[in-house]
Amino acid sequence: MSTDVSSAENEGGAPIRTARVPKYYRLKKHLLDMTETLPPGTPVPPERTLAAEFDTSRTTVRQALQELVVEGRLERIQGKGTFVAKPKVSQALQLTSYTEDMRAQGLEPTSQLLDIGYITADDTLAGLLDITAGGRVLRIERLRLASGEPMAIETTHLSAKRFPALRRSLVKYTSLYTALAEVYDVRLAEAEETIETSLATPREAGLLGTDVGLPMLMLSRHSLDKDGRPVEWVRSVYRGDRYKFVARLKRPQD
């Protein structure tokens, strides 16, 4: 594979060799510039066409395209081709619901219930919910969508003892937070949220309509009420190619 080597000079005049630039990276940069000028849904030229245009192999073209798919700049649709992707959904890191976040972006939030039932708390989950190990926990797994597009898989855990009959209450109140407020007079006041990366499992990829192994954003949120009592522990997996999180930072007070 051919590469470019460039050099510069430091303050003493001695040359500084910079990193080699792989050929696929130059192609990737060209494609990236192209995506910034074309509307979402625009088809990308086929691999064969790009290989001929840039006098390179289809393997090199495939590598450039795959990196842009992983980064969320391009979208590959099975049997149709590769297209310019829609801009990522941007979410501020704050204590709001998924519904509030999506509506703030002008998107229509919907959910599909994947599973709901009771599990037995292990030591870790018991500590998070401030219950006895072996206690019952209501586990709710939902597929979160934005204007019909799958965005995340969200799994919520709540103490069955603290919130009796919550499963029945959710039939009346489709919003979990509304049910907690109206039925149990419990509202979230603060939370600790951790963001990590993971790779999409076959099940996650199938539900989210993406590729197995695609980078995901994995969020863990531990929410408390105004008295500092645990309310929920939530583990969410968001599509890394469609989602980004934004935080506003301030310097600590002296």
From Swiss-Prot:
SMART domains: HTH_GNTR, UTRA. Gene3D superfamilies: Chorismate lyase-like, Winged helix-like DNA-binding domain superfamily/Winged helix DNA-binding domain. InterPro entries: Bact_HTH_transcr_reg, Chorismate_lyase_/UTRA_dom_sf, Tscrpt_reg_HTH_GntR, UTRA, WH-like_DNA-bd_sf, WH_DNA-bd_sf. GO terms for biological process: negative regulation of DNA-templated transcription. One of its GO terms (cellular component) is cytoplasm. GO terms for molecular function: DNA binding; DNA-binding transcription factor activity. It is found in: Cytoplasm. This is HTH-type transcriptional repressor DasR. It comes from Streptomyces avermitilis (strain ATCC 31267 / DSM 46492 / JCM 5070 / NBRC 14893 / NCIMB 12804 / NRRL 8165 / MA-4680).
